[in-house]
């Protein structure tokens, strides 16, 4: 299901949280209410962890991850890294990355199988991304925007892209990602989709300003109405992909 939330009256929930199928990171902040919204929906299935990255609360923009791993920028402190390591499942690999484009969440986006990255991302970062997150990496733009991590959000079920993405681009991206895509907005018309929402295979959190129409589009494209945490479907898809590669 899709839920509305805000972080200290700020609707950009995608800046203050990072959600995957294996864990959820939530910014350290004055608003315990924000954390409890996530915990109420997710705590039965995955760990919900208070964290900061490089002293910042905008953790959703600073890191990139999926159920296999998490990449954080090089200026993440040892203490922060250790806290995240201790809080996440053992199966999740965590790695610091030396990258000029250090707001990794703005320049990369991924699900458990595929990643889109900024055209100028460092080659070494691309290799680390493929290795740690176990994804296939594509250098792309979304609606001519290089910040793919800001203007595109997708799970293993579907994706939402910048509203000005052409039909041709949507089709191309959809065939790369192997999920259906819809052009849309969150937070009453915001084009910066990834700043306004986070999603995994069974749950989405959008900013408080998100209209009911936007929310129903999110529930529809990410197939959230019939979704629940499922290891069976995940392992079936994994074995299918292994047999094809």
From Swiss-Prot:
PANTHER family per UniProt: TRANSLATION INITIATION FACTOR 6
Post-translational modification: Phosphorylation at Ser-174 and Ser-175 by CSNK1D/CK1 promotes nuclear export. Ufmylated by UFL1.
Name the UniProt record assigns to this protein: Eukaryotic translation initiation factor 6
UniProt tissue specificity: Detected in bladder, duodenum, liver, esophagus, pancreas, adipose tissue, megakaryocytes and testis with lower levels in muscle (at protein level).
Keyword Nucleotide-binding: no
UniProt keywords, alphabetically: Cytoplasm, Initiation factor, Nucleus, Phosphoprotein, Protein biosynthesis, Ribosome biogenesis, Ubl conjugation
Modified residue annotations for Phosphothreonine: 165
GO cellular component: cytoplasm; intermediate filament; lamin filament; nucleolus; nucleoplasm; synapse
Entry-linked InterPro entries: eIF6
Function field: Binds to the 60S ribosomal subunit and prevents its association with the 40S ribosomal subunit to form the 80S initiation complex in the cytoplasm. Behaves as a stimulatory translation initiation factor downstream insulin/growth factors. Is also involved in ribosome biogenesis. Associates with pre-60S subunits in the nucleus and is involved in its nuclear export. Cytoplasmic release of TIF6 from 60S subunits and nuclear relocalization is promoted by a RACK1 (RACK1)-dependent protein kinase C activity.
GO biological process: cytosolic ribosome assembly; miRNA-mediated gene silencing by inhibition of translation; miRNA-mediated post-transcriptional gene silencing; positive regulation of translation; regulation of fatty acid biosynthetic process; regulation of glycolytic process; regulation of megakaryocyte differentiation; regulation of reactive oxygen species metabolic process
Organism, as annotated: Mus musculus
Gene3D superfamilies found in the cross-reference section: L-arginine/glycine Amidinotransferase, Chain A
Chain coiled-coil ranges: none
Consequence of gene loss (knockout): Embryonic lethality. Embryos die at preimplantation stage.
Alphabetized GO MF terms: ribosomal large subunit binding; ribosome binding; translation initiation factor activity
Modified residues (Phosphotyrosine): 113
Family: Belongs to the eIF-6 family.
Subcellular location: Cytoplasm; Nucleus, Nucleolus
Chain positions found as Phosphoserine: 166, 174-175, 235, 239, 243
Known partners and oligomeric status: Monomer. Associates with the 60S ribosomal subunit. Interacts with RACK1. Interacts with DICER1, AGO2, TARBP2, MOV10 and RPL7A; they form a large RNA-induced silencing complex (RISC).
């Amino acid at each position: 299901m899709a839920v509305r939330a805000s972080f200290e009256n700020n609707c950009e929930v995608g800046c203050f949280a990072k959600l995957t199928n294996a864990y959820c990171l939530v910014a350290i902040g004055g608003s315990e209410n924000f954390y409890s919204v996530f915990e109420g929906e997710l705590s039965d299935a995955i760990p919900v962890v208070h964290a900061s990255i490089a002293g910042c609360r905008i953790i959703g923009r600073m890191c990139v991850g999926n159920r296999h791993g998490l990449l954080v920028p090089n200026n993440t402190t040892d203490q922060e890294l250790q806290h995240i390591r201790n809080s996440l499942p053992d199966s999740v690999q965590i790695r610091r990355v030396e990258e000029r484009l250090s707001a990794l969440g703005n320049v990369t986006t991924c699900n458990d199988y595929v990643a889109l990255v900024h055209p100028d991302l460092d080659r070494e970062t691309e290799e680390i991304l493929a290795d740690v997150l176990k994804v296939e990496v594509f250098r792309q733009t979304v609606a001519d925007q290089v910040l793919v991590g800001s203007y595109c959000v997708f799970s293993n079920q579907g994706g939402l892209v910048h509203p000005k993405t052409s039909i041709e681009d949507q089709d191309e991206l959809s065939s790369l990602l192997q999920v259906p895509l819809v052009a849309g907005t969150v937070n009453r018309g915001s084009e910066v989709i990834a700043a306004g929402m986070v999603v995994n295979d069974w749950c989405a959190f959008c900013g408080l300003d998100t209209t009911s129409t936007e929310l129903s589009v999110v529930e529809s494209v990410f197939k959230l109405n019939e979704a629940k945490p499922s290891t069976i479907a995940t392992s079936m898809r994994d074995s299918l992909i292994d047999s094809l590669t």
